[in-house]
A protein has these predicted regions:
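N-terminal Lys/Arg-rich, disordered targeting/topogenic segments
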Residues: 1-8
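Short amphipathic alpha-helical segments
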Residues: 6, 80, 465
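N-terminal amphipathic/hydrophobic interface segments
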Residues: 8-74
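Short, solvent-exposed loop/hinge segments that bridge or flank secondary-structure elements
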Residues: 171-191
């Protein structure tokens, strides 16, 4: 028995000695192993994207600390994309043993990223290269929950609990225009971060401040952005690239990830904006102002779908809504569902919350009574003819107390009409008996009246300004031909468009048209 114990002890000692020797060898050779691993990755990346990636030194300090100096990334025959003077990262040792990367502390100095485009050549073209080998249809299934989980795990893994980033510069230049964002120092202490941000777009300079929290253990992200000296934040690049001018006072955001049933991911959080001003010609010819907007959201992500739960609360000014959205991919075809139901609420909550600049004719309108609203849009792109569209705004004891900027009842008597072309007034004349070309309805042939009615709006006497079936058929046709090919306007809608609205084709005009039509039909103006 003693002999076996002796042999076992000897075997244990030998195994332990070998293990110590191996670990010692790995420790002393860790820099060589690290450089070889990184070198292989760099070589593959260089060959795949046509880059030149260089650094002066890469080494490990201890068992979990990495130092890198003078890194540069230069695309072939392009301007330098990235330079980094020095980087020090301390990783989680136990996570590293399991093959996972979790950054505990990071210090970076003089990180500079430059996106440069001259004519049609850019130093970031490689980012948009198509993959050489496409995955055959049906060979793999998309798992959106898995994708979201991987992205968030990567994000939380690389965002440190503590760290300092000094002199971070990110710039974009196209010909003579440029945007430069500079962070003098970003400090992260016990999951909380704060920093000043200097922004310059061409000759315009701004000074922002950001702060927030990144909590890896709770999978939570919080951030706040505001301008210094009580100025508005003007988001750069968007005006030059998309023609959109967006300004705001403050922006806050939070995100928390949790696990649901059957491998689903639940994302909850809030986003809020104060003092928002938006201009884009496709939205409205005037700047749209939103005093306060907020969303408390709950998003469920599954293997083949993403869903905005109806417990989500959207608030703009006085109005509160609970929308429902779902996008699902079935056999490589999308299926979208959108729904909104709001039970009886004071009518002036809606009309008093309309963003300024979006509905110019209705600004200042005062109403009384109650409203309720139901909306449903269900689109299966595999079966476009099955499309469902329901929209109904009901009223109870509703009345207009005071008109806004425009008298919606002016068509009850003679009024002055101005015709516009390309946004410019071309002619002004009265609509009524005083105009020499005015023709009363009873002087027009009943056959002509019926012909116009049947060709334009056969159900004119039976609806209240809207034909949901006509809108549904028009939307189905547009989806089939993949363009706006058919309209679903009633005569009332065409009348409102010509009398009250301009010819600008934008989202605001269509929404304002619908509201004015409903008011005219409901109040019999």
């Amino acid at each position: 028995m003693g002999k076996y114990r002796t042999k076992g002890s000897i075997a244990l000692i030998i195994t332990g000695s070998v293990l110590i020797l191996v670990l010692t060898g790995l420790y002393w050779g860790r820099n060589g192993i690290l450089c070889r691993m990184v070198g292989k990755r760099i070589l593959r990346t260089e060959q795949k994207y046509g880059l030149s990636i260089r650094y002066d030194a890469l080494r490990m300090k201890g068992l979990n600390e990495i130092e890198l100096s003078n890194l540069s990334v230069v695309p072939d025959k392009r301007d330098t994309l990235l330079t980094l003077h020095a980087l020090n990262m301390r990783l989680s040792f136990w996570k590293l043993l399991r093959g996972k990367i979790e950054v505990r502390n990071v210090t970076a100095d003089r990180l500079k990223v430059s996106f440069i485009k001259a004519d049609s050549t850019a130093n970031y073209d490689f980012l948009f290269l198509k993959k050489e080998q496409e995955v055959p249809a049906g060979s793999a299934q998309t798992d959106y929950a898995h994708r979201v989980n991987r992205i968030l795990n990567l994000l939380y893994g690389f965002l440190p609990e503590n760290g300092t980033l000094r002199q971070v510069d990110v710039s974009e230049r196209k010909d003579r225009n440029f945007v430069a964002i500079r962070i003098p120092q970003l400090s992260i202490r016990q999951n909380h971060f704060n920093s000043d941000i200097e922004v310059q777009e061409d000759s315009v300079r701004q000074h922002w401040t950001t702060c927030g929290e990144v909590n890896r253990s709770h999978h939570t992200l919080k951030a706040e952005l505001y301008a210094q000296h009580k100025e508005k934040i003007a988001l750069p690049y968007l005006k030059r690239r998309f023609g959109a001018d967006i300004r705001l006072d403050t922006l806050t955001y939070s995100l928390t990830e949790s696990e649901g049933n059957s491998g689903q991911i639940i994302l909850t959080g809030q986003a809020a904006v104060n003092g928002l001003e938006v201009y884009h010609k496709a939205l409205s010819p005037q700047t749209v102002n939103l005093d306060r907007g907020q969303i408390s959201y709950r998003v469920l992500v599954g293997k083949e779908f993403a869903e905005l739960d109806s417990t989500t609360l959207v608030q703009f000014n006085q109005m509160q809504l609970h929308p429902y959205l779902k996008a699902e991919k079935r056999e490589h075809q999308w299926h979208f569902t959108a729904a909104l139901n709001k039970s009886w609420f004071p009518a002036n909550e809606l009309f008093g919350s309309l963003p300024k600049g979006l509905f110019s004719n209705l600004e200042g309108i005062k109403t009384d009574g109650e409203l309720s609203y139901h909306f449903l849009l269900d689109v299966d792109f595999a079966l476009p003819d099955s499309l469902k569209l329901e929209s109904e705004l009901k009223e109870r004891n509703f009345r207009i107390v005071k008109y806004g900027a425009t008298d919606l009842g002016k068509m009850s008597e003679e009024f002055i009409y101005t015709a516009y072309e390309n946004g410019q007034p071309v002619r002004t004349f009265p609509i009524g008996p005083s105009w020499e070309h005015f023709t009363p309805l009873d002087s027009i042939s009943p056959l002509l009246q019926m012909s116009v009615m049947q060709s334009e709006d056969g159900a004119f006497y039976y609806h209240r300004g809207f034909l949901p079936d006509a809108m549904r058929e028009a939307l189905i046709q547009d989806l089939k031909v993949k363009r706006f090919a058919r309209g679903g306007s009633t005569i009332t809608m065409q009348l409102v468009k010509n009398v009250f609205l301009n010819r600008n084709k934008n989202i605001a005009r269509k929404l304002e048209e619908a509201l004015i039509v409903w008011l005219i039909e409901t109040e019999r103006l």
